[in-house]
């Protein structure tokens, strides 16, 4: 059975890239254009992994991440955070907040992404 991956990003071109790439690697892609839609799809689809952009309108990636990790039905879904933040210190400060129940994301990628880096990180996180 193909694993389901939910990609949450406000850029349609990025979602298209994810969708095509994930399909090519035998994953079932699910997409959402913002955090509100992403949380809804996570609850409906119960994906095996979530790719989550940090900078989005309506609901930021950090707020979405906090809601995922505080939801008893969703907290165990692994999340790969995708950000433009390249400094490890800045990235860690974003996640060093009690509202995520001390649960860091399972992966982190910095934009711009390559297909190879994305697939390697997904494979690492999914085991």
Please provide the spans of the model-predicted regions.
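Active-site beta3 strand of CheY-like receiver
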Residues: 45-51
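Receiver (REC) domain active-site loop signature in two-component systems and cognate sites
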Residues: 56
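A short, hydrophobic beta-strand element within the central beta-sheet of small alpha/beta folds
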Residues: 76-89
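Charged docking surfaces used in two-component/phosphorelay signaling
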Residues: 16-24
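Alpha4 helix (beta4-alpha4-beta5 surface) of REC/receiver domains from two-component response regulators
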Residues: 63, 67, 86-109, 116, ...
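Helix N-cap/capping motif at the beta->alpha junctions
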Residues: 31-40, 61
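Short amphipathic alpha-helix used as the core "switch/output" element in two-component signaling
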Residues: 40, 62-75
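Active-site residues of response regulator receiver
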Residues: 9, 53, 83
